[in-house]
Amino acid sequence: SLRDFNPDDKKLFVRIESPNEYPNYFFRNLDGELNQITYFANPFKSIQNVHKEVIKYKREDGLDLSATLYLPDGYNFSQKEKLPMIMWAYPREYKDKSSASQITKNPNQFTYPYAGSPLYWLTRGYAVLDNVAFPIVGEGNKQPNDDFRVQLVSNAKAAIDKVANLGYVDIDRIAVGGHSYGAFMVANLLSHSNYFAAGIARSGAYNRTLTPFGFQSEERNYWEAPQIYYNMSPFMHADKLKSPILLIHGEADNNSGTYPLQSERYFNALKGLGATARLVMLPKESHGYRAKESILHMLWEQDTWLENYVKNKKEIN
């Protein structure tokens, strides 16, 4: 990518990267000659050679969707072993289908795992479907959330159908995960579909009546659209939860839409109804987790959950 241009020296200042090459900076002259400026080493050697591709597919209503599929280093494409998979996503609202279908993923970007990334599980033998498109579309006078649940489940089905057709994934061992509004998505999917073996929901909101003056892109208040708030709230459908769910929340979350009460009350409802659920509260953490101890414990909790309820699901059953 171009960072600067010096017309007098006829030089470009550029950053060069690839899926397995850490970004570094160079001068490039108009003849194409490169002069490297930085020599940053790749700190993520364990996932340096994983397979990465942007996959494209269609939803039932014809909407074009995409996601980034990762397979572990050394995956044998001729044998096509069916792997457990983690799907990670975040729903977004749109007012037209063309905007919802835009592809913003670049397969040539360096594979950079952040603290809460699902990519670490590539080293544990999982496939990872990251940045999965989850558009919620409302065109004309229709608002996106008018059929939120239907579109949410349809997005999940389209992604699972695609990876199933590719032949890399065991569709009986798929987990779904998300943070914040992504956690809200997870709880809804586990309540209204049978596609997932387990879920991981971090710092989410599960009772929309506790955010009565709107949330995300929803501008209607509770009193204007009570049925929408009810239908979208996993808390109201806690009796329908079909798969084990891991709830993680910062004990000091001050984000107005995701106070810790959301996870605490949802967990109480799930346990009272006999669901398989675990609640982890991280001390002194807000909406995003910062302390090394918190991040490492979060990763341990997620790994334990995935190993028990996804990878080794058949052995447990």
PLM region descriptions:
Residues 75-77, 95, 254-255:
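Short beta-strands and strand-coil junctions in structured, solvent-facing domains, enriched
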